[in-house]
A protein has these predicted regions:
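Accessory (non-catalytic) regions of SAM-dependent nucleic-acid methyltransferases
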Residues: 1-22
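A structural feature that tracks compact, well-ordered secondary-structure segments
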Residues: 3, 23-29, 173-220, 226-243, ...
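DNA target-recognition patches
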Residues: 18, 42-78, 110-111, 117, ...
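A short glycine-rich beta-alpha junction/loop motif
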Residues: 18-20, 115-121, 154-180, 310, ...
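Non-catalytic DNA-recognition/assembly elements of restriction-modification systems
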Residues: 19-49, 229-251
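Short, solvent-exposed loop/turn positions at domain surfaces
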Residues: 23, 75-81, 158, 190, ...
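A short beta-sheet element
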Residues: 85-144, 157-158, 268-270, 285-352
Length: 434
């Protein structure tokens, strides 16, 4: 990023209007761009489905158009369907239903189908002037959200829709670059969309492979061998309870007023769940002095020990990655020590399998809160092969998890780069060569 662009961005952040730019309802834009209400660049779609046989779609927040029967489990009646609005490829539908991800509703473009019918509660339109793909990027970016938030009356109607009239929706003002620039912006951002789509597909395929392997590489109920084995192993697996091949413990209690903002990491169930999902979580700590006092009686967590959640989202595992100081919350997390009779990576993989999920759902104390206790962990049955086979199976899943994490991070990096580019290109803070 050159100095001119950097200074331009800094000026806008300070609330200033850079040279060559102007400000209006659509924000700070290049002086040679115009800004127009959506009503000036679009036409409202009123065509109804009638008795035509069209696929019916709905909008799912964060996904886009989905088959309505698959979403709701039923088709609409003929009387309702006849009033549905007909969309064609390139048309848009605005869903006034608010959600956590889209508090001002969301606008989607029909891209994967040539024609479809959508509920007439959606506001449907097509771009009459300009490049629809450019405007799609504006809608995806949520460019209208601030304006819509000012127009929407607080709360929702009895039908769950936002208090926003069609006139208010179409009065939102959008940036309108010259057509050639619209097309170039859309081309750049669409290329990122394709890269994101391909990377997401790879992540999904790896997740699907993992799910399949978790079924095939562990014995089914009633069997002592898995469906698929690595070469060189033929001996039956032995079913044992966790408490017979390792120690199952709990940490000493730490009161909340002893938590700190720095020091020794203090793991709770939320930290384990976040680590399992690859999400960030606000961390808690305890002082080094308290940690040293506690481990005198409870012992130290060591590399390859396993923590498994006993409250909240129960049965979620975490392998301690190193011997650096770490302490865990007592009832929240059950502590499974490493031992010579099991391989931690193998046991971790088992704790992520469908067989284990089915087992734990049947034995956990479920009331208002589910619990997985120390005694239940000790009594949990696990089919164990030889240490050598455990090592091979555990290493396979460990490498597969690392590969999934790598591609997930690459996906997130591309998504973040596109998000930053949208902010710059759709406001004209960075201009494209046409």
């Amino acid at each position: 990023m050159d100095d001119v662009i950097r200074k331009r961005i800094e000026a806008v952040r300070r609330g200033e209007v850079p040279e060559g730019y102007s400000t209006g309802d659509a924000g700070v834009l290049p002086a040679d761009w115009s800004s127009k209400p959506l009503s000036d660049i679009s036409s409202v779609i009123t065509e109804q489905a009638g008795d035509r046989d069209l696929e019916t779609l709905s909008i799912s927040a964060g996904i886009g158009f989905v088959n309505q029967a698959e979403k709701f489990g039923k088709e609409m009646s003929g009387k309702q369907y006849s009033k549905y609005t007909v969309l064609r490829k390139g048309d848009f539908a605005y869903n006034k239903g608010n959600s956590k991800k889209y508090p001002q509703g969301c606008t989607c473009m029909l891209k994967e189908r040539d024609e479809a019918a959508v509920p007439n509660v959606f506001e449907c339109f097509r771009i009459a002037v300009g490049d629809p793909l450019y405007y799609e990027q504006l809608f995806v970016h949520g460019f209208m959200n601030k304006q819509l938030a000012r127009k929407i009356n607080h709360g929702v109607r009895d039908d769950g829709l936002l208090n926003l009239t069609n006139e208010e929706f179409y009065s939102t003002v959008l940036p309108v670059p010259p057509l050639a620039e619209q097309q170039k912006i859309a081309k750049i951002l669409s290329a990122y969309d394709r890269a994101i789509e391909l990377k997401q597909k790879l992540v999904d395929e790896l997740q699907s492979l993992k799910k399949t392997c978790l079924v095939k590489l562990f014995p089914r109920v009633g069997s002592d061998v898995p469906e698929v084995r690595f070469p060189g192993f033929t001996a039956p697996w032995e079913q044992r309870k966790v408490g017979t091949f390792t120690s199952v413990l709990s940490a000493s209690r730490v009161h909340k007023d002893e938590w700190r903002t720095e020091g020794v990491p203090f793991f709770r169930s939320s930290d384990v769940v976040s680590a399992f999902k690859g999400d960030d979580n606000e961390r808690a700590f305890i002082s080094t002095e308290l940690y040293e006092e506690l481990v005198k009686s409870s012992g130290r967590l060591e590399k390859n020990d396993i923590l498994i959640t006993g409250g909240g989202s129960i049965g979620i595992p975490y392998i301690v990655p190193n011997n650096e100081p770490l302490y865990s919350k007592d009832a929240d997390l059950i502590w499974i020590k490493k031992s010579e009779e099991h391989v931690s990576q193998f046991l971790f993989a088992y704790f992520t399998s469908q067989g284990f999920r089915e087992y734990i759902s049947g034995i956990s104390h479920v009331g208002t809160i589910a619990h997985y206790t120390i005694e239940q962990v000790k009594d949990t049955p696990v089919s164990l092969p030889s240490i050598a086979e455990q090592s091979v199976v555990g290493s396979f899943f460990s490498r597969l998890n690392q590969l999934i994490t790598l591609h997930q991070r690459e996906l997130e990096a591309v998504q973040q780069k596109k998000k930053a580019l949208m902010q710059l290109l759709l406001t004209g803070l960075v201009r494209v060569n046409v």
